[in-house]
A protein has these predicted regions:
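Ligand-binding clefts of soluble mixed alpha/beta catalytic domains
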Residues: 1-353
Length: 353
């Protein structure tokens, strides 16, 4: 179900767009709320504008109830048509194909330092067919990118960390955003491509009280439930539960591919050394000797998580040069397209909410 909201949707009517697969909201006109600003002032004494209560910008940027923000009615209708072009008419069928097109950009030069940010959209533009990427929830939970695209004409869903926003760390909202998107792709048979560059899930009292464990479990549950073809690409790093959330090897995607120099581990080298060898290092009185031992341990740890070493143990299926990544993905998704999905007699997940 697609909802293109041109005006207000109040009280019980606000649940109509909430039940839809996607909500397109007209900027300045569309709104949805359970209680109007006037009611809020009368009942709870809160003075608020219509936009603050339930406007299009609020719902597409704060609550996540809206998926797309458009400037006109015509733009909303055109966007709805484009959105539907990635889906089959029935879940029994395969997603429709389109004429193949070359990417619009060259593969970007990625920073060697895994802590330096880059724009993941540049990498996406270098992989998918030109002008085919339709980003969903662009204004909400920006540390994660989700959207539909075409790869050699085939429709795919993309889940990608965005190092340019919050370092690509997963938060409560980004976990919810990913879970909803993955469930939608699974429902309509759209294959999934994960582009992982993630330090892990956010930590601290604030996110714990917001339910980061519950939200993270929801995302990981969605990944494990997905029956569509899944390919995970480790761009530079994937640590901790972030590796699970991005369909890492433990969740047996159809393929787990890595770029040269990528790292996967329970945690990064510095964090791992501090966690495992803290007492040993603190027992060394000489600062120079402590630093020497720290560097020695760091080198040993990096050797253990070396991507070629992991590939030799079949943890990683392939280590691919950046220039060959698109052709590798095209070849693999084409092979997986003929796979028949086996359905269990009963399939009913109890999802963390």
């Amino acid at each position: 179900q697609v909802c293109v909201l041109f005006g207000p949707s109040a009280a019980g009517g606000a649940y109509i767009p909430a039940f839809c697969d996607v909500v397109v909201m007209r900027d300045g006109n569309a709104s949805m709320y359970l209680g109007s600003p006037r009611m809020a002032e009368m009942v709870i004494g809160e003075k608020v504008t219509l936009e603050e209560m339930g406007g299009a910008r609020m719902h597409t940027g704060v609550s996540g109830c809206g998926h797309f923000l458009v400037e006109s009615d015509d733009e909303g209708i055109d966007l709805a048509k484009r959105y539907l072009s990635y889906f089959p008419t029935s879940w029994h069928e395969s997603p429709p194909t389109a004429p193949p097109a070359e990417p619009a950009a060259e593969f970007p030069e990625l920073p060697v330092d895994e802590n330096k940010p880059f724009d993941m959209r540049e990498l996406i533009d270098a992989l998918v067919d030109a002008e085919s990427f339709l980003e969903v929830h662009k204004r909400w939970a920006k540390e994660l990118i989700v959207g539909y695209a075409r790869l050699d004409g085939r429709a795919i869903g993309i889940v990608a960390n965005q190092p340019k926003q919050r370092g690509g760390v997963l938060f409560v909202d980004s976990s919810d955003k990913a879970a909803r998107f993955i469930w939608t792709c699974t429902a309509f048979g759209v294959p999934l491509l994960f582009l992982a560059d993630v330090p892990g899930f956010m930590i601290g009292t604030q996110v714990e009280r917001q339910g980061i464990i519950r939200a993270g479990a929801k995302m990981i549950s969605a990944v494990s439930e997905a029956t569509v073809p899944k390919i995970s690409v480790i761009v530079r790093k994937a640590y901790g539960a972030g590796l699970y959330a991005m369909a890492g090897p433990a969740f047996e995607p159809d393929a787990c591919i890595a770029l040269p120099g990528a790292k996967i581990a329970v945690m990064g080298p510095q964090a791992a050394i501090n966690a495992v060898f803290y007492n040993q290092l603190q027992a060394i009185d000489d600062p120079a000797e402590r630093e020497r031992r720290t560097e020695e341990l760091r080198a040993e740890y990096k050797e253990e998580i070396d991507i070629l070493h992991l590939a030799s143990e079949l943890v990683i299926d392939a280590v691919v040069q950046p220039g060959d990544l698109r052709s590798e993905l095209v070849r693999r998704f084409a092979a997986y397209a003929s796979r028949e999905r086996a359905w269990p007699a009963k399939h009913n997940a109890v999802t963390p909410v």
